[in-house]
Amino acid sequence: MPTNFTVVPVEARADGAGDEAAERTEEPESPESVDQTSPTPGDGNPRENSPFINNVEVERESYFEGKNMALFEEEMDSNPMVSSLLNKLANYTNLSQGVVEHEEDEDSRRREVKAPRMGTFIGVYLPCLQNILGVILFLRLTWIVGAAGVMESFLIVAMCCTCTMLTAISMSAIATNGVVPAGGSYYMISRSLGPEFGGAVGLCFYLGTTFAGAMYILGTIEIFLTYISPSAAIFQAETADGEAAALLNNMRVYGSCALALMAVVVFVGVKYVNKLALVFLACVVLSILAIYAGVIKTAFAPPDIPVCLLGNRTLANRNFDTCAKMQVVSNGTVTTALWRLFCNGSSLGATCDEYFAQNNVTEIQGIPGVASGVFLDNLWSTYSDKGAFVEKKGVSSVPVSEESRPGGLPYVLTDIMTYFTMLVGIYFPSVTGIMAGSNRSGDLKDAQKSIPTGTILAIVTTSFIYLSCIVLFGACIEGVVLRDKFGEALQGNLVIGMLAWPSPWVIVIGSFFSTCGAGLQSLTGAPRLLQAIARDGIIPFLQVFGHGKANGEPTWALLLTALICETGILIASLDSVAPILSMFFLMCYMFVNLACAVQTLLRTPNWRPRFKFYHWTLSFLGMSLCLALMFICSWYYALFAMLIAGCIYKYIEYRGAEKEWGDGIRGLSLNAARYALLRVEHGPPHTKNWRPQVLVMLNLDSEQCVKHPRLLSFTSQLKAGKGLTIVGSVLEGTYLDKHVEAQRAEENIRSLMSAEKTKGFCQLVVSSNLRDGASHLIQSAGLGGMKHNTVLMAWPEAWKEADNPFSWKNFVDTVRDTTAAHQALLVAKNIDLFPQNQERFSDGNIDVWWIVHDGGMLMLLPFLLRQHKVWRKCRMRIFTVAQVDDNSIQMKKDLQMFLYHLRISAEVEVVEMVENDISAFTYEKTLMMEQRSQMLKQMQLSKNEREREAQLIHDRNTASHTTATARTQAPPTPDKVQMTWTKEKLIAEKHRNKDTGPSGFKDLFSLKPDQSNVRRMHTAVKLNGVVLNKSQDAQLVLLNMPGPPKSRQGDENYMEFLEVLTEGLNRVLLVRGGGREVITIYS
């Protein structure tokens, strides 16, 4: 019986002794007076108000007044004295977030309230007893015994009670693992399994509690309309066939009225519900005692309760008083009222029903007593279809052929089809309610002792009551009476009430108030559970239900609960509502067992339950039994409940706030990750499994914000959530000075990764210089077999500016590091022009310029990009370069065949490059590059002059490039080069720098370009011209990236070559293979 919320007012209090405790409650630094209205710390995660050592707020002077602990003075800010910590622990009250005051605070002043703490018997045992015993025991248990028989009924009850006992053992382990927060099973599950499981199971538990309220209200109305006041029915059946529909309509009307009345009572004040709790409990106890007293009485004085049978069929004793066809009156024989029900007249010659005419009417005792031997007749099941006759086994009957069942005949018929699994679903709600003690944990003297003891004792007691009642019902009551759900054969009396002593009204009135009180407590507890979930903030759309009245009463949650409860009342059938809430409670219990099993198997250091009588096998058995019972009850209800829980889980995972509750699922994930990492090969992957595992190198500005966020957009387009992505960056400085900036930078990167939907890991390094930091990232990023094989970085656009934090020297060194590590390198040039994830290219080309083969990565990257919606409509074109002595036609055929085997569709074009003379532009471009390099080395320029000189040379190179096609004259000699330096300025520099010899400037004017540089520049210029001619309008151009020179003296020239190679192109991706990445033609 799942009334899992018996609400008791929780007052702020101080557990102190004597005057010292009273004084502590008045001091502002006491544990009770710490502001608990804002349970959300700086990380945004609500925490339980617990005595964590970093939350102790006491003035530093009080720690070391005598200077005895001056040695530890520096640690006092974060680590308190042991005496202070123990004081906090001793005065800790386990009031957690989500716990609200259930009674109005008549005066708003904070004062000490010495509320009596409850022990095991009052605080746990009796509430569990009250919540477990209830409506199913009074209204359906006799019917279950009649349909399933004693043996199968015993099996049903044993399975359900075993399930709850195993769940109680798991719950006891969880509840005794530390101070128990008030809040019940939701807090235990959510803090053990994490916010996703906690929210999903919490909502299922809430729905179960809400539908439980509907079930109790329906039970209350059924008792009222069937056994207390049948004349109060609004809808009357015109025929016997319409009685069931009329009853359902009456249940809907009266149930809705009862729900509205109960909701008003709960809204006005829950204190009235709490005051009536003892009355409801007394009703339950008296009813149970009356049942046992009635059983004992049947042993020596069975009650006289006749049941009329026609043949072997049970008759509904409503419109006749004599169980006979005819009776003798004044020496004459006359027909009875029963005759007139089956015949068309009262005369002996009237036409009667064929079955009535051929079978005799007999009368048996409905409750023959314990000593009657009826137990053997009730031992086995008697399942039947809907509308079947309730027949007594072993009684002879004359069958009739092709009998039609005319309406109006007073037979007792079954209203629903009965079978084993259906009875399990109807019965299971009667064993729920084991969480009542944990919901009162905030008001217990010793919750870690009371919850296991009280809960397990309550389950043992109720299991004994249920099992003994099954045996006693089977031994005392006739089978046809047991199968008579509504007591029609007993003139409409409650079957279990007829057994009770001293009067049937003890059971009728007791069960009425018991179910009424259970409904009130469900409507009290369910809104508070929803309010606790809403206040946790894990489900954003439920946050409105976290608000309530000024005193904390959950008004909006109560309104939603009443609406959901109304849907259950509109179903109107107790037998249809019971399996629904069975699903939700079974799911809740399943995850309680899962939480205990996971924590035990992981052996986490904080898993130290005080309750020792648990084992992971018991929890696993309980979880399996819950899952089995779900599908036994109703496989489609089970799938629907699991679908709801799964949707809630994914919603919380997708939209919910990030919570860190130290849950077991995180530990399980870590164990699974460790196991998977140990299985991953440390060597290179197989050819067929190779994919780029990317380390993205980001640059940060002075505010620790990402300079080029579109680099992450490009990463998500390239990876599409598959494989490994590590986003790294370097901060210059020492870790002691920069750890705050490092944390802020990591938060900025993570938020940008989330915005760009880049799934991966963030790794930030603080190093004395950027060069070493980048090298450390390339060497150490990743773990075990999960290491990157590709480095993605942005081209340093302003590399010619000497004060650029990521200078060209760092860039070239990073290129060398990736080459040494045999890793691929991707350099995105003009990264700010790359598309964001929201953009779409409706047309265009991705051009691949395949100059040298370094593993086939150039062809793999466009294929991966085109899987993303941004690049999906772009065509792929592959260009390769042919020299004069190459057969370009055969090259094109071979390349097309190669792509065919690679299963890549792309246009192929072979571009011929004629070896002509080195142009004047190339010679001058090389000269400008070398002159600039020499000048910057030889002249000690100021920062502003150096920048201006670099810009002037850059401008002249650009102007030279625009007029290169019109030049036909021979390469200019060095003396024709126009320099911005005058002779006077050079003399002034010479006097300023005495150590600079005059030969340096003389060499500057007689400089001749190096022939290898001229050849490289010639290649760059020629290739750039060819690429511009073919791919200037391409959406993306992929090019082989030349390797850096072996000598570091040519690093700056290398940067200039790359600049010339890619000049004039919008989006360029320079690709340098590491030698290990491959693309294969094999499957």
From Swiss-Prot:
Function, in words: Mediates electroneutral potassium-chloride cotransport when activated by cell swelling. May mediate K(+) uptake into Deiters' cells in the cochlea and contribute to K(+) recycling in the inner ear. Important for the survival of cochlear outer and inner hair cells and the maintenance of the organ of Corti. May be required for basolateral Cl(-) extrusion in the kidney and contribute to renal acidification.
Subcellular localization: Cell membrane
Disease: Defects in Slc12a7 are a cause of deafness due to the progressive degeneration of outer and inner hair cells in the cochlea and of neurons in the cochlear ganglion, leading to the loss of the organ of Corti.
GO biological processes: cellular response to glucose stimulus; chloride transmembrane transport; potassium ion import across plasma membrane; potassium ion transmembrane transport
Phosphoserine modified-residue sites: 30, 33, 50, 62
Bilayer-crossing regions: 120-142, 150-172, 197-225, 250-271, 272-300, 420-440, 451-473, 505-531, 555-573, 574-598, 613-635, 636-651
PTM-bearing positions, type Phosphothreonine: 37, 973, 980
Positions on the Cytoplasmic side per record topology: 1-119, 173-196, 441-450, 532-554, 599-612, 652-1083
PTM statement from Swiss-Prot or TrEMBL: Glycosylation at Asn-331 and Asn-344 is required for proper trafficking to the cell surface, and augments protein stability.
Residues the entry annotates as binding chloride 1: 433-434, 589
Residues annotated for K(+) binding in this entry: 131-132, 429, 432
Activity: how regulated: Activated by N-ethylmaleimide (NEM). Inhibited by furosemide, DIDS and bumetanide. The inhibition is much stronger in the presence of 50 mM K(+) in the uptake medium. Inhibited by DIOA. Inhibited by WNK3.
Family from the record: Belongs to the SLC12A transporter family. K/Cl co-transporter subfamily.
Membrane topology: Multi-pass membrane protein
UniProt GO molecular function: chloride:monoatomic cation symporter activity; metal ion binding; potassium:chloride symporter activity; protein kinase binding
Segments in the Extracellular topological domain: 143-149, 226-249, 301-419, 474-504
Glycosylation sites noted in the Swiss-Prot or TrEMBL record: 312, 331, 344, 360
Region (Scissor helix): 664-680
Recorded catalytic activity of this chain's protein: K(+)(in) + chloride(in) = K(+)(out) + chloride(out)
Region (Disordered): 1-55
Name under which the protein is recorded: Solute carrier family 12 member 7
Sorted UniProt keywords: Cell membrane, Chloride, Deafness, Glycoprotein, Ion transport, Membrane, Metal-binding, Phosphoprotein, Potassium, Potassium transport, Symport, Transmembrane, Transmembrane helix, Transport
